[in-house]
Amino acid sequence: MSMRFTFWIMVGIVAISGLSQGMLLPAIAMIFEQEGVSSSINGIHATALYIGILVISPFLEKPMQKFGMKPIIVIGGFLVIISLFFFTQTFSFWVWFILRFLVGVGDHMLHVGTQTWITTTSDPSKIGRQVSIYGVFFGIGFAVGPYLASTVQYGLATPFIISTILCLIGWLLLLPTKNAFPAQDEREVKSKSSFSRYKQVVGLGWIALLGPLAYGVLEAMLNSNLPVYALRKGWSVSDVSFLLPAFAVGGIITQIPLGILSDKYGRDRILTWTFSVSTGIFLLAAVFDQYYWIVFACMLLVGMVIGSCFSLGLGFMTDLLPRHLLPAGNILSGIAFSLGSIMGPVLGGVFIEKIQYTSFFYCGYDYNGNSRNGIYGLHEESIRIKKNRK
């Protein structure tokens, strides 16, 4: 099987994974809101998926080096399929929490495997483009997810059944692909623990982790808390299901152009620009949040500007690290994303519950403004890191 064909199988699987994640967050948020669960508890429940990512992360590098990337992806995909199926068998707050946790474990295994495969097999001059295609396909799946979530009105099990079937199809397509192994420095693999390599990654490429961290906060906050805020404003389930994909669609539109621009001008410059512009867009959404179509346009624009920051951060990590550290770098990117995703729903839920007389979008404005300030010196710092590597 050709490398090119395998690449498209990988990004296709990522699209289906994105669909299941994009469905899971708003579907459960809407179900719990209709059942009278508080917004803060709803937000805490959403963190289960990302706790799963955190728990499995330290245990992926060694098996991937020993057994290859395909077994990690296959096992992760199978775990997602089984977990989604069991959502249809019961309705319980804590059982669903555990199932969300298992989906997080499986999804992260799948993503670390596919990310490592793409970043270690791609031409270095086309890393931005290839990772952007990965991001586009995940974004397409994630954008379709909320539409799938709206099928909950036909029965609680409906979105979970459809998602299970689609994940099974993607998993079966993966089985004929050939296994591949990440690049290794044999001396370091034998003499250093995984945690030593994680320390190296943080020392060389900590700046690149800001992209996945910021994306995790915003993605989880918008998909977990925005449905609650919108329903309380009196918008319908169909309105919410149409609004949520705007962020992901915006990211799809600009993902590849921003990836190509980052190959040309540097991922550090593009990341700095995205944080600055998105802060102003969130402020606009906060001022005009009583107007549905203005909010929709703002979510689309925010997605266009900052919806690529995960893939930009991943590409930036590839720029800063030697190839044998890329598996550890991809794992830490996932950890940064999951930490952000745990923070996002909790912060958003508390904001909605405690600050009831102002717009939810001020939460995004404040966070993005602080992120922008935090990376003000990013370009100069990245130059220093690159010089130290030479």
Language-model segments: residues:
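Paired small-residue
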Residues: 94-102, 293-301
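Central cavity-lining transmembrane alpha-helices of secondary-active solute carriers
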Residues: 47-60, 245-257
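Helix-loop boundary and gating motifs at the non-cytosolic
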Residues: 3-50, 216-229, 233
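Structural signature of the two symmetry-related core transmembrane helices
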Residues: 71-85, 269-283
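Symmetry-related core transmembrane helices of the 12-TM Major Facilitator Superfamily/SLC fold
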Residues: 159-175, 361-376
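Cytoplasmic helix-loop-helix junction between adjacent transmembrane helices
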Residues: 101-137, 316
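Helix-to-loop junctions at the C-terminal end of transmembrane segments
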Residues: 56-68, 255-266, 352
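Juxtamembrane intracellular "pre-TM" segments in multi-pass secondary transporters
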Residues: 1-3, 181-208
